[in-house]
Regions:
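TRNA-binding/sensing appendages of the translation machinery
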Residues: 1-99, 103, 159-163, 180
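N-terminal targeting/leader regions
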Residues: 2-15, 201-250
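Positively charged, Gly/Ser-enriched RNA/tRNA-binding surfaces
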Residues: 21-37, 47-48, 83-92, 100-114, ...
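Proline- and acidic/polar-enriched loop/turn elements at helix boundaries
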Residues: 45-46, 181, 203, 234
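Short low-complexity, flexible loop/linker segments enriched in glycine and/or proline
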Residues: 55-59, 193-195, 296-298
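Acidic, His- and aromatic-enriched active-site or binding-groove loops in soluble protein domains
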Residues: 60-76, 195-222, 302-303
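Short, surface-exposed recognition loops or helix-turn segments adjacent to catalytic cores
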Residues: 176-186, 203, 281-287
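Terminal amphipathic helices with adjacent charged low-complexity linkers/tails
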Residues: 186-188, 195
């Protein structure tokens, strides 16, 4: 029987021209990482379920690609008995494809902690998998390009990671790039004022959807949190006109403070000392959904191409504690290669591709062939691409 060749939804092949453009982006990113003294590591595509589960929040946990165990593990179960399914679930899968590169990094550090010098500056460029609904710019297999600094709480690390973002997009010459900065601590302080601490995850997820659902729908959904009209008006004001000093002053009237304000201001003060290619701004409604961020959070978008985040990251103080290391604080960023590729393509910013074969030797006979074979080696040994 003939099988129709097709790919599963959300997965792709890449031809040589596409790969050449992707490798152009990867080289720029990795070169910038190296210039900031980051070391490259790699981790396996497969991690244990217990390593990944519970680190990303309930919504993200559902997107983890689980791998069925091998063997005839169904032989002892009555598949017609619904009661067996609950018992069976925990035996079906004990491994999964990695969802991101950060949690595997925490596992890697915990396993190799005695062989690592801290602060540990690592970068990693590998594929990740998410069982998400495929759409424009969103795939089930895609490459992440991460840089993390582990073992230091110094805010200069946040500054350097923002500079890495800025430097990469400058080298890519991608106009309209916006780097947004916020703090999970500021969001926590605001949620305290609004009395929604017990629904913090739901609150920040709604905040993160503000641009997508619009002001009217946002206000309507706020009613689910029993927020007063006064507090609702305050929230809309700081969403539309975010100012760190205003938010800090307002909350202080109620005895609520947060070091997140001072941390963000420190980063912006340091960024004023440099010439920045990207627009860098404070964005109160930035509330990245991953549960492990505890401090500063970042996100990168492009105003000229609407495709979502080109990158993101933040500070995570407790991630390695799940593996028994309580003192390790970390901060990291990630580049979304596919979306960056899409932006460069949409804006026609890729340089014209050089021909793969820069030198062509013609064969007019056996004598000429013998001569060409010798000269071909000379060209190739000199780094010049050639074919016959």
């Amino acid at each position: 029987m003939n099988v129709k060749p097709k790919l599963p939804k959300g997965f792709r092949d890449f031809d040589s021209k596409t790969l050449e453009k992707r490798e152009y982006i990867i080289k720029i990113i990795s070169d910038v990482f190296k210039s900031y003294s980051f070391q490259k590591i790699e981790t396996p595509s497969v991690e244990s379920i217990e390593t990944l589960s519970g680190k990303y929040g309930d919504e993200a946990d559902r997107l983890i690609f689980k791998i069925l165990n091998s063997g005839n593990y169904l032989s002892d179960y009555d598949l017609n008995n619904n009661a067996d399914y609950k018992e069976l679930t925990r035996f079906i899968s004990k491994k999964a494809l990695r969802y991101d590169l950060t949690v595997p990094l925490a596992r890697y550090i915990s396993q190799n902690i005695n062989n690592i010098s801290f602060p540990f500056k690592r970068y990693q460029i590998q594929n990740v998998w998410r069982a998400d609904k495929p759409q424009k710019g969103r795939f089930r297999e895609f490459m992440q390009c991460d840089a993390d600094i582990i073992g230091s709480k110094n805010l200069i690390n946040e500054y350097e990671l923002v500079r890495i973002y800025d430097k990469v997009f400058e080298k890519l010459n991608l106009p309209g790039t916006i780097i947004s900065i916020n703090s999970r601590k500021i969001l926590t302080a605001v949620s305290t004022k609004l009395n929604v601490e017990d629904k913090f995850s739901e609150f920040v997820n709604l905040l993160d959807k503000y641009d997508k659902i619009g002001k009217i729908n946002f206000i309507e959904e706020l009613k689910n949190f029993n927020i007063s009209k006064e507090d609702s008006d305050f929230l809309i004001k700081i969403i539309e006109n975010p100012d760190i000093d205003y938010i800090k002053s307002y909350l202080s009237e109620f005895g609520i403070s947060s070091e997140g304000f001072d941390e963000c201001k420190y980063i912006f003060e340091k960024l004023k000392l440099t010439s920045n290619f990207c627009e860098i701004k404070f964005n109160f409604k930035l509330a990245r959904g991953l549960d492990y961020y505890t401090g500063t959070i970042f996100e990168v978008e492009n105003s000229k191409v609407k495709i979502g985040a080109l990158g993101g990251g933040g500070r995570y103080d407790n991630l390695t504690s799940i593996f028994g290391n309580n003192e390790l604080s970390g901060v990291g960023i990630s580049f979304g290669l596919d979306r960056i590729y899409y932006c460069l393509s949409e804006l026609s910013l890729f340089k014209s591709s050089n021909e793969l074969n820069k030198t062509l030797f013609l064969n007019f006979g056996e004598r000429e062939l013998n001569y060409n074979l010798k000269v071909l080696d000379v060209f190739r040994d000199s780094g010049i691409s050639a074919t016959i």
